[in-house]
Every structure is written in C-alpha cells, then in structure tokens.
C-alpha cells in the first residue's frame, strides 16, 4: 500500500526512448519503496503538477545542438514564461538524471538548462542531479544503476516507509501499470477477427496518430550500386491536403515514419507465448483503465493487430524486460541467468549478450523458452514501436507535386540498416526492413517533425552559405539548396561533400553538376577511398581557407550534417583555426566567431 504523502512524479523528455525506459524503471523503484509514483512525458503535465507530489524526478536527454527533446518543448516553453515569479516553485523538491554524450559539444545541455531554470524559480534539489555519459565505460546503463542505487539509499535513510512496511523485494512482481485482463476476459467471441494472410508484408492499416498525414509511397529507388556495401534509397511520398491544409516543410524538418512488424514474426511470437486461443479475439481497449502514451491504435483491436502495428518485439531488450521475463520462467536456470543480466555486477555480460550482439526481444524469448509472458501484461512488459525521423531531402518548388497542386512531394535519403554481429543471422533495422518491403503505392500515416534552425527563409538566402555534409547528411543540405534557389538573388553557395567512393556514393551528382555548370553552386568533394591518401571534408575546407574567411566576414551561414561528431568537430576546427591565425585582433575575432551562424544536424 502506498501512503498518501509519499508521492513521486517522474517526468521524462526522450527522443529515442532511453529516457522513457529509465523513467519507467524509476517509477517501479519508487513503488517498491511504497511511494505512489506517476510517470509521464514532460509535455503532458502543466507547471501546477510540480507542486503536488513530495518529490519530482526529471529524466531528460539532449538532442540536436543542446536542445530539449521533442516531447518536452511545450513544458519548456511554459517554464520559460517571463511572468513566472522567482519563487513560484519554492515548494518543489526535485532532481534530474541527464542522458548525454560527451563527444557532442553541448553535452547534457537539456538537463543543465532545466536545472538552471528550476533553480531560478525557487525549486530545491533533494539529491544531487546526475549527468550520464554515453562514453563512460559502462555507458548510460552503468550510470543509471549507480545513481538509482544512491537514490534508493537516500529514500531509505531520509524518507523511510511507515513502521511495518518493508520495501517490496525484487523477486515480487509489481501490479501492472496497464492491463488487458478485463478486455480479454470480456471478449466472449471465440473466433473473432479472421487472422490476416501470412503473406509476409506489413499491415496496411492506417494508424490513428495525432497530427498525422496520410502518405503514399511513389518512389523507392536505390542510389548505390547493387554490389555496394551500403543500400541507400531515395524514397518519395505524395502527401495530400489534410482538412484543406497542405503539408509545408522547411529545410531541417524531418518526416517521421512508423514501421510495422511482419506477419510471420508476429505468428512466431504468438506460437512461442501460446497465445493462439486469444490472438484474434476482438478486444475493446476502451475497457482498460489506462493505456500507454503514444499507443496509436483504434479502441477495437485484436492481440494480433497490436503485435503487427504497435509492439516492438524486434528491439534490444532492456534490463527491465529481462527482469520481467524472470518472473514468468518455469526453469530455475533460466530465471537465475535472466536475473544476473539485471544486476550491476553483471552489466558487462548484459552488454555482450544483448547490446553488442543486437539480440532482439523475440530472439531472447526463443532462447529462454521456459518464459511464457501473459498477454494481459502486453503493454506493461513490451516496448511500443517508435517513429523514426528522417531529414527531408527536398525543398522549395521541389516539394510541389508535378501534376496535382493538392499534394506535397516529400523525398527522403535513407541508408538501410543492415549489418552483422557475433550472431550468424544478419541484423536489419525494423524501419529499414519495413521500407525495403512495403509495396509501391502503399499508404501509411506519417508526421512532420519541425526542427528550429536559423538557416532558412528569404532573408537568410541572401547570405553566403557553406554547407558541409557526409553520407546521407546531404539530405537536409539538399533541401536547403532547393529553398535558396527559389529565392531572388541568393548568396553564394559552397557545398563540401564527403563519402567513400565517387562512383558509388556521390548522391544527386547530375543535379549538382548542373548547378555548377549554371554558376549557382560551388562543389568541393572528398571521397576518402578513391586514392591511397584518405581525403576528408576538413581537408577540403583547409584548402579553401581564404574563401571560408570571406564567408565569415560576409556574415555567412555554416551548416554541417552527417553521422559523425568527429567529422563535425574536425570541420569546425578547419573553419576556425585558419581564421584565428589571420585575424590578429583577439576581440574582433571573438566577436565575429560569437556571431557566426553555425548549425549542425548530427545523428
């Protein structure tokens, strides 16, 4: 039983799901200490909600260039309101757990900004905030285990449960946060929906996603040669108007794709868990007391449909999932091994077993075959499928449909994720497999993720641009070039593009060659594997130091996109160091560099 004044609100801001998983685990830790815990994403709550619980714990990652996660922007906007008096949060006792990567320049800035603002408004920390680093030897998981251990001991020492209440042991399963028990019991039909054909193509069901757009797949062409190590696609969608409004995107925006599972994999899981008798019974989800945030499904569904469209059993299992497995194992050896993976002293073994090998949840369940998870706890145990963000690769007039003014044409430059690990079976990303296999003219629900950036618009188009990209980082750069070319008299544009091989990896070569011929674009290429001495974009930047200096003096824009923080850092060094040597006046140099527009999108 939870005592009324023992309440904890756990709030998370998450892009990839790590912060959410950790927030859910914190909620369970607090439950075991007899706190009444509530876990929510930041945008769901208003500021008054911070005043109600005894303690507030924030779990927040940093995205982009020190930005708040997408699902915390509304909360952050509320927190920044100027009319808030300095002591309005004086009764709030809080702490933060920040997730970051020290290879990024603005390490853990989201957590730092949040701490600073909460302090300004009078809130006080009840335990020191923590900044986890992806680069630690034991990664974010190790940091989380150590910090939650300190939090647990702090609560035990300073806020013990009332006399007679001992912490709930780890080997006792907690009540489910979300349960399908009622709706499964109330489904009296024995042969509800007819199972879909086991033709191995993802479901064509349009998901009811808030603010979603219906997109039709109209192009899915491979840009790299068939024998090339990487399969890079130019994927095109047509998006019709929604409620009379046309989809409008600007450079830097992303299109979010929501992948689905494959029918044969779903059947494997149903058979493995012995869910055949209930897999196709109609379920009324409106009978559930609560449902997870970001569960995109109709109220009438089936277990099979939920597995096809919503449940991510291809994800790498987190330690909390393995702990849940242990509760339902009938094999003592299996149970012991699963519990070992959740212990701090066995973090290395968990990393080797799950993370390094990229084992999926389905594969782990097949290996620990004694585990039979109850369907009633589906939402409580399994993660949900998350949308994947892809930078939009076209802009300006190139987003106009060639024949239908009511549609927007969106293009994505996508490198399909296929690789091998220590396991023999090749690994393939869920979204990559989905995009590789959905038929042409399929419809799906997508969303637009706006990215705030200081690089686009008519006024910025007049300024010179230095665009630096590697690999598929060319996507947002191309969108920006498209937009600038629709503006009258755009400023000079310099593209520095790097990849492995000119013949295989020079995306949009014909398009850029034409712009060079027309005098609208200057291109500097760095293909690292085409000669004995490797050449990178930073080398080309150094070769053009005088030109770069002119752009700096002319209030230019610098844009860096790609999949490597090392590349971004090297590019920045190549831009700044020659300039610093040439401009001897220290104050002038500092002033110019401080006012420089530098935007980067690194993933």
UniProtKB/Swiss-Prot annotation:
Its main location: cytoplasm. NADP(+) binds at residues 472, 528-529, 534-538. GO terms for molecular function: flavin adenine dinucleotide binding; FMN binding; NADP binding; NADPH-hemoprotein reductase activity. FAD binds at residues 358, 388-391, 429-432, 603. Residues 210-457 form the FAD-binding FR-type domain. It holds the Pfam family NAD_binding_1. It is found in: Cytoplasm; Mitochondrion. It catalyses: 2 oxidized [2Fe-2S]-[protein] + NADPH = 2 reduced [2Fe-2S]-[protein] + NADP(+) + H(+). FMN binds at residues 14-19, 61-64, 99-108, 134. Its cofactor is FAD; FMN. Residues 8-152 form the Flavodoxin-like domain. GO terms for biological process: iron-sulfur cluster assembly. Transmembrane segments: none annotated. GO terms for cellular component: cytosol; mitochondrion. Its EC number is 1.18.1.-. Keywords: Cytoplasm, FAD, Flavoprotein, FMN, Mitochondrion, NADP, Oxidoreductase. NADPH-dependent reductase which is a central component of the cytosolic iron-sulfur (Fe-S) protein assembly (CIA) machinery. Transfers electrons from NADPH via its FAD and FMN prosthetic groups to the [2Fe-2S] cluster of DRE2, another key component of the CIA machinery. In turn, this reduced cluster provides electrons for assembly of cytosolic iron-sulfur cluster proteins. Positively controls H(2)O(2)-induced cell death. Belongs to the NADPH-dependent diflavin oxidoreductase NDOR1 family. In the N-terminal section; belongs to the flavodoxin family. Interacts with DRE2; as part of the cytosolic iron-sulfur (Fe-S) protein assembly (CIA) machinery. This is NADPH-dependent diflavin oxidoreductase 1. It comes from Gibberella zeae (strain ATCC MYA-4620 / CBS 123657 / FGSC 9075 / NRRL 31084 / PH-1) (Wheat head blight fungus).
